[in-house]
Design a protein with these regions (language model features):
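Short, charged, surface-exposed secondary-structure boundary motifs
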Residues: 54-57, 76-78
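Structured segments of extracytoplasmic/periplasmic soluble domains
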Residues: 8-12, 34-38, 57, 61, ...
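Hydrophobic alpha-helical
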Residues: 1-55
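Short beta-strand elements at the ligand-binding edges of bilobed clamshell
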Residues: 60-72
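Hinge/cleft segment of the Venus flytrap/periplasmic-binding protein
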Residues: 70-110
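Short, hydrophobic secondary-structure boundary micro-motifs
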Residues: 18-19, 66-67, 93-95
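Glycine-rich, flexible loop/turn motifs
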Residues: 54, 63, 98
């Protein structure tokens, strides 16, 4: 689906299209496939999840970056909220879990 959507964006927006922020690495990789077919190597593409394929795409310079989603951090954040609630407390409405940007200089690519 990301290939088709990106092809449509290339047709509709032409060179005004300068960035694609995808919901996950697989969508970002589909967008990259369409961008390559359209000879558009100038578009900033960001994925999410830091999958092996996503990290490889960053390493190869195909994707600008991906975002590492820390499952342990997310689970720990959820556990803190639940524990606070069980103990009768009022947890914050929003719990921020830090993320890590994985770009060409990231230690996660080493």
């Amino acid at each position: 689906q990301a290939v088709t959507v990106t092809e449509n964006w290339i047709t509709t927006y032409g060179h005004k299209l300068n960035a694609i922020l995808a919901n996950n690495d697989e969508m970002a990789l589909g967008a990259i496939k369409a961008l390559e077919a359209g000879n558009r190597k100038d578009v900033f593409v960001l994925g999410v999840d830091a999958t092996l394929d996503g990290r490889n795409a960053v390493r190869e310079g195909l994707m600008a970056a991906t975002v590492f989603q820390d499952a342990n951090g997310q689970g720990g954040g959820a556990a803190k909220v639940i524990t606070t609630k069980i103990k009768g407390g009022n947890p914050e409405k929003i719990t921020w879990v830090p993320f890590q940007l994985v770009d060409k200089d990231s230690p996660l690519l080493k």
